[in-house]
Amino acid sequence: MPLFNSNSKLEILNQIKEIPFQLERQIQHLVEANLNTLLGLEFVKSEFTISGSVQRLRIDTLAFDRKNKAFVIIKYKQDKNFSVVDQGYAYLSAMLNNKADFILEYNEARNELLKRSSVDWSQSRVIFISQGFTSYQKEAINFKDLPIALWEIKRYSNQTISFEEIRKLNATESIKTISSKNSDVDAVSKEVVVYTEQDRLKIIPEKVQGIYNSLRNKILDLGDVEIKATKLYVAFTVNGSNFTRS
């Protein structure tokens, strides 16, 4: 999407040029310095290495989601030739097999006491951040219960940064339909749970559902609002933050 600057009289438009990041490290530094602003997460560690099923895996940024009491793995990508599903589940599988290492790293880095029982491992997730994803990669995340998110980041000549999540398009299929073909997907799917709006609605009375749907439609009409279901509630978010009225 092209962006433009306008003069004070709003008559002449000048296109704002994109200035691509040359290195993954540049993106990593920017995101880590603004982790709470961009994603609402706490920074734990850079370049954290853990044992995978085949080889050791390097986590670019390890973060913690205090709201959901869960760890979040962040990977930065320049190369477009990788499977977001296969790689994402490989990291989640490694996390679940090395829980003690994550607790220890958090306690040392944050100088806090986090107990293993205080972490909700079912809410673990992976975030890939890139300047652009292929259409195949965007299609690959179109499962309703995929604990993987894609975010695109771009830098422009007027010192503007855009940061946008690739949204799933009416996803109805479950990742469990392909879990038998991938041991990591199969193992992780037994422990990590992604909740949907329908999951939350099933447990409330029909009368309350009607009230909710009425409010839901009014909130969505405001524009640029996304629904995020969690283990305990459904949130309406704007730019990654829960929607509130001031």
List the model feature ranges, each with a label.
Residues 1-246:
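Charged, terminal alpha-helix-loop-beta segments
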